[in-house]
Amino acid sequence: MSKVIFLDVDGTLCNYEGVIPESAKQAIKQARKNGHKVYICTGRSRAEVYQEIWDIGLDRMIGGNGSCVEDQSKSVYHKKLSETEERAVVDWLHERGLEFLKACKETRSFKDVMNCLFFCPYDT
């Protein structure tokens, strides 16, 4: 019977320096070889996931604190904030002097994040 395995990233799959133990890599590869699906489940957006994690070979992810679900690179679920909600969050962060990163469904890499920061159609 095949199973679905969900792995957290920070502090579970990777230590806080971003290092993935070789034993974890081998366990994931063996699980997939045995017919199980392996997903990461993380607060990170897809663009914030280390390339080394993707290189292991995963069936995909639940990311952005549950706001997006991908299976085999296909978007299965995507919940975005309305423009009003986004503005309220951005204002709240600015009022407190907090740094933040906005990512969207189209953000697939850190380069995309940087492009979004400099060419965002919605002023922050």
Where do the model's predicted regions map?
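Active-site phosphate-binding/coordination module
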Residues: 19-121
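Short, small/polar residue-rich loop motifs at catalytic or cofactor-binding pockets
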Residues: 1-2, 63
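Asp-based phosphoryl-transfer active-site loop
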Residues: 3-18, 40
